[in-house]
Design a protein with these regions (language model features):
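Active-site- or binding-pocket-proximal scaffold segments within functional domains
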Residues: 1-353
Length: 353
C-alpha cells in the first residue's frame, strides 16, 4: 500500500456512478488502483443505476460495482442484509456502519499500512469520514495513521447527534476542512459544526458558502460548486493524494467566481428548501462574519480580493484621500479590464457608481 491512501464516501442516495458529483469524480480522478491507492464507498440508500446498451465501458463497470450499503457483507462482499436497506439508508443512514467495516477490512488486508489517510465525503458520507477516523483511532494497528478529512456539508440526519463518533473528531485527525452551506433551511438537514471543544487538536478550516445542501458538491452546476471542487482538490493534493487533471484556479479566477455568486445571490438563497421544509424550518446560525455584509461571500473571498486588488481593497477599508485618487482610479481601470464580473458586482451592490 502507498504512503497515502484516499477514501471517498458518497452522500445519501448517491454512489460512484454519479460522476457529476464531486465525491464520485474524485475517485475517478485519483491516480492508482482501487483498494490499493484509493477506495470509494457508495452512499446509504443508494442503488446501482441501470445502463443501456449504448453505455460506455466505464458506465457498465461503475454500474456493476455499485452496491447498496447494508446488502453485502462488508468483508466478504457476499449478498446479505435487508431488502429495505435502501429505504432505511435514506431515512436513518443505515449502511454507514457497513462502509466503515468495509474500509477497515480493506486496510487490514494489507501488509504495509499507509502513513496517511485522506478522506472526503458529502452529507452522511462526511459523517462516515468521522466514523472511519474513530475506527482507525480505536484499532491499535491503525491508531498511528495520520488522518485528514474534507467534508461537504456534513449532515448526520435526525437521531444521530447523540452518537459522538458521528459528530466529533478523534485525536488522529490532523487536518479538517469543511464546506458548510448557509442557506439550507430544512430542519432535518442540521449540519455538524466542529468547534474547538470537539476538535482541540486538528487544524480546522471552514468555508461558509451560499446555497442549499447539495449546492457545493456539483461542480458543473454553479460557481460555488466549482470553487468547492478547486478547494477539495487543493486540500487532497497538499496532503499527498495524486489527482489526474486537478482543477486550478488563480486568486483572480476565484474573485470572478465569487463575484458571479454575489450577482446571483438571490437564486442561491432560494435553493435550500424543497418538500422536506414541511418537516420543519431552521435557519443555520453560522459564524460567517461576512454573511450579512453587502459584498464579500466569506473570508476566503475577502482574502483572494485583498491579494488580487490590494489598492481597491485598501480603498474599501480606509477610504481614498485626494493624494491616492490617481492610484485608485488606475487600479479600478485595471480591475474593470481584467476582472469584469468583479467590477459589475461592485457596481450592482452600490460600492461603485
Amino acid at each position: 500500500m502507498p504512503e497515502v491512501f484516499s477514501v471517498y464516501n458518497c452522500g445519501t442516495s448517491h454512489n460512484r456512478q454519479n460522476l457529476d458529483e464531486t465525491i464520485a469524480d474524485l475517485a475517478r480522478r485519483t491516480v492508482g488502483a482501487e483498494n490499493r491507492d484509493w477506495m470509494i464507498n457508495d452512499g446509504p440508500g443508494s442503488s446501482s443505476h441501470h445502463v443501456g446498451k449504448s453505455a460506455t465501458p466505464l458506465d457498465r463497470s461503475l454500474a456493476a460495482q455499485a452496491k447498496t450499503p447494508g446488502t453485502r457483507d462488508p468483508i466478504s462482499g457476499l449478498k446479505e442484509g435487508s431488502a429495505l436497506a435502501g429505504i432505511r439508508g435514506v431515512v436513518s443512514g443505515y449502511g454507514c456502519e457497513h462502509n466503515v467495516d468495509h474500509t477497515m477490512a480493506v486496510l487490514k488486508a494489507t501488509i504495509d499500512l499507509p502513513r496517511t489517510i485522506n478522506m472526503a465525503g458529502w452529507s452522511r458520507g462526511a459523517i462516515t469520514c468521522f466514523m472511519i477516523a474513530h475506527a482507525l483511532n480505536e484499532d491499535p494497528r491503525t491508531k498511528a495513521i495520520a488522518v485528514n478529512i474534507w467534508a461537504f456539508d456534513p449532515v448526520p440526519g435526525p437521531g444521530n447527534f447523540d452518537d459522538p463518533e458521528k459528530v466529533t473528531l478523534p485525536a488522529n485527525v490532523q487536518n479538517y476542512a469543511a464546506i458548510v452551506q448557509q442557506d439550507e433551511r430544512r430542519r432535518i438537514f442540521k449540519p455538524v459544526l466542529i468547534d474547538d471543544d470537539h476538535a482541540p487538536g486538528p487544524r480546522t478550516r471552514f468555508y461558509y458558502m451560499p446555497g442549499g445542501h447539495s449546492t457545493g458538491v456539483f461542480r458543473s452546476k454553479n460557481e460555488v460548486g466549482l470553487i468547492a471542487t478547486f478547494l477539495v482538490h487543493r486540500f487532497l493534493q497538499k496532503h499527498g493524494t495524486r489527482l489526474n487533471n486537478p482543477i486550478t484556479l488563480s486568486p483572480r479566477d476565484l474573485c470572478e467566481l465569487y463575484a458571479k455568486v454575489r450577482v446571483e445571490m438571490a437564486e442561491y438563497q432560494k435553493s435550500g428548501g424543497g418538500a422536506l421544509l414541511l418537516l420543519g424550518r431552521q435557519r443555520r446560525m453560522l459564524p460567517n462574519r461576512f454573511q450579512d455584509t453587502g459584498y464579500f461571500i466569506n473570508d476566503h473571498h475577502a482574502n483572494q480580493f485583498r491579494k488580487t486588488f490590494p489598492v481597491v481593497w485598501s480603498a474599501l477599508e480606509h477610504g481614498v484621500g485626494a493624494a491616492r485618487q490617481p492610484a485608485f482610479q488606475s487600479a479600478l481601470a485595471t480591475l474593470k479590464h481584467t476582472a469584469p464580473t468583479t467590477f459589475l458586482s461592485l457596481e450592482k451592490v452600490g460600492i461603485l457608481s
